[in-house]
Amino acid sequence: MQDHGNARRNVDHHADGIGAQVLERRVHDLNLTGDKNDAVPEREPRVDPVLGTTVHIVGARQARPNLPDNRSTSDCPFCVGGLEAPEPYDTRWFVNRWPAMDGDRCEVILYSPDHDASFASLGVDGVARVIDLWAERTEALGARPDVDFVLVFENRGASIGATISHPHGQIYAYDHVPARSARLMGPNGWTPTADDRLAFAGNDTMVAAVPHAPVYPVAVTIAPRERVGRLAELDARGRRDLADMLADVLTRLDRLHDAAIPYMLWVNQRPFSSGFDDAWLNVEIVSPWRAANLPRYIAAAEVGAGEFFNPVVPEELAARLADLGD
């Protein structure tokens, strides 16, 4: 494994809690006056010299498999007997053959051997097994000296970018704390909403709510009622309650438009670098659908100005989701 110790970004956590500003670039900026014959890497993080935006150039991933609608289990690399699952399993992880970052930083998490399952259809027991694996892999990757932050995530649906339809998620291990994650998990960062109009479901230890100012028309956050930093810090009851909430919320989302809704899901956890003692674990789920099979595209004014226009009122979404429970 590569040691990126000297290549880590130094991050300054401002006292005002605004977040993290990148002080040192890990990679050279694009050299517009350089030798045109210089080899251009297929996988390289770059930083916009004006906006400070980090963009990972991942040309090598253009060749990855694209089988979003495959129905034959014999063709699926994630089904038992397939390329990535030669033996029977309940849950399974492996290093991604088509990584977005070098150094064994990208892993795939298989939720179930059932090709036609969804995350929600696994039930509480099945989702709990996935959470256990998420926690295990988060801590294993975070123990590496070249890892500062671990992001667990899932893309569901071909329209979101999933290239294989078998139920699975992924994990990325960063050698720095991305700016958004630093803001959420840092001082004066994210905490659960106190607005009862936005909370729509809960159990003994977890609560689900619609964010106050969501970018996407469908957006939900699930979090512990008491502050916990990472998945591994949840006790057995907490993990069970999180599994219950995930299965519940994902089922409601599919009922929202009477269809399997495409979504993006990710887990915000405390980074492994210092300065994040106040981090509050949460799971975000968003979908671009503003109606059945009708996505809301983030358009020119939003991309250009960096301000967004959401046609769905958060309080109304929360009320609808509340009505869709069992």
For each feature predicted by the language model, list its residue ranges.
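Intrinsically disordered, low-complexity segments enriched in glycine and mixed charged residues
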Residues: 1-11, 35
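N-terminal non-cleavable signal-anchor helices
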Residues: 2, 12, 19-23, 28
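Active-site microenvironments that recognize anionic phosphate/pyrophosphate groups
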Residues: 24-27, 31-166, 172-231, 237, ...
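Gly/Ser/Thr-rich active-site loops/lids in small-molecule metabolic enzymes
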Residues: 239-245
